[in-house]
Amino acid sequence: TVYKNLEKYPDIKVVIDLHRDAIGTDENKVKPVFTYNGKKGAQIMILAGCDTDGERGFDCWEENLNFALKIQDKAETLYPDMTRPLNFDYFAYNEYVCNGSLLIEVGTESNSIDEATYSGSLLGNAIADVLLN
């Protein structure tokens, strides 16, 4: 689906693969939250992969990492404690599809829909700020 949309809309600059994380065990679930303006939100985690040896054909990994760092910085500036540490490692999920492709985890299965939705709205503001400035 992503490739079909990229072909149909070649001006797409950002592809976000959005998920909920799974942390903990069945007996001990983790619910990462922060509070902004008196309202609880699900903490987010941005994942940025790399391909330092060129084996995966993931040429844009450095640009994606730079984009991830900008979003992380903007989100923390606007909404302190919104983000968990950026996850940077030798993986590529769907981040290789184009420059500006990232995987973002919004909370976990233990967070409420309201917490995840609130964070999604704040995250959208942070991403828009990065793209427009």
Predicted regions located by residue number:
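Second-shell loop/turn segments in exported
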Residues: 1-5, 32, 53-62, 105-114
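Catalytic-core regions of hydrolytic enzymes
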Residues: 1-33
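Loop/turn elements at helix/coil->beta-strand transitions in domains of secreted/extracellular proteins
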Residues: 9-14, 42-43, 81-82, 99-100
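Structural recognition of the beta-strand scaffold that forms the well-ordered cores
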Residues: 14-17, 45-48, 85, 102-105
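Solvent-exposed loop/turn segments at secondary-structure junctions
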Residues: 20-25, 51-54, 91-94, 108-112
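A short, glycine/acidic-enriched catalytic loop
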Residues: 23-57
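Active-site-adjacent substrate-binding region
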Residues: 60-87
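Active-site-adjacent mobile loop/cap segments within catalytic or ligand-binding domains
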Residues: 84-133
